Regions:
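Conserved beta-hairpin
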Residues: 78-134
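Membrane-interfacial loop-to-transmembrane-helix junctions in polytopic alpha-helical membrane proteins
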Residues: 61-64, 88
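Canonical hydrophobic alpha-helical transmembrane segment
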Residues: 65-83
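Terminal and domain-flanking low-complexity segments
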Residues: 1-12, 139-193
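Eukaryotic phosphoinositide-binding membrane-targeting regions
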Residues: 19, 132, 138
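N-terminal membrane-targeting/pre-transmembrane regions
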Residues: 1-62
Length: 193
């Protein structure tokens, strides 16, 4: 696990394993999408019934609800298959915080956890991946960050801008969380002054 300070306090780097299928933040997003999808599906089916038949009765309400529920169930099964079988409940993120901003590379590979267990709820320490297929990079400039939110129990810091969440920063342990929190407080304070 690379948790380097690059010789000075101007840069912090580390790797973190991020659970997918058991991550509370991802599950919350997924649940929200499922509720919105179910309501939209139910509403669209009722509008279609009204358009084609001119009225909506109680059996139509029930039938639309069953179809909306079945659709959500299908999406949930697909989510479980992708999360636990395709992605093996995790991916690796390489974070770098420096004077220019926050940088994150999401690396698609099999995370080699340095702590035992397959079913993690929070981010966890991982060894540096030797090989990987793909990686997606995201950069957030400190000028775009207006504030950040702490989710201490999950060891996550959320960078916020004018349009909402810019980046989630996952920390593999409490020590790294405190280091990153101090760094963010210093950077945001210096950007405001």
């Amino acid at each position: 696990m690379d948790m380097t300070h690059s010789g000075n306090s101007n840069e912090i780097r580390w790797y973190a394993g991020i659970p997918v299928g058991s991550n509370p933040l991802i599950l919350l997003d997924f649940f929200t999408i499922m509720v919105i999808s179910a309501v939209l599906c139910w509403g669209i089916l009722l509008l279609a019934q009204f358009y084609f038949d001119g009225h909506v009765a109680l059996p139509h309400l029930y039938g639309a609800a069953v179809i909306a529920f079945d659709l959500c169930l299908l999406f949930s099964v697909f989510y479980v298959i992708v999360s636990f079988i395709v992605m093996r409940n995790g991916y690796v993120a390489r974070y770098r915080l420096d004077m220019t901003g926050a940088h994150c590379e999401n690396i698609k590979c099999r995370p080699k956890s340095t702590v035992p267990g397959f079913f993690h709820f929070c981010s966890y320490p991982v060894a540096e991946p030797q090989t990987y297929n793909r990686c997606v990079e995201k950069h957030v400039s400190w000028a775009d960050v207006s504030s950040f939110a702490e989710l201490r129990s999950l060891r996550v810091l959320i960078l916020k801008g004018r349009r909402g969440t810019l980046m989630r920063i996952y920390c593999p342990d409490s020590q790294k969380y405190e280091t990153v929190l101090t760094f963010l407080n210093d950077r945001i304070a210096s950007e405001r002054s």
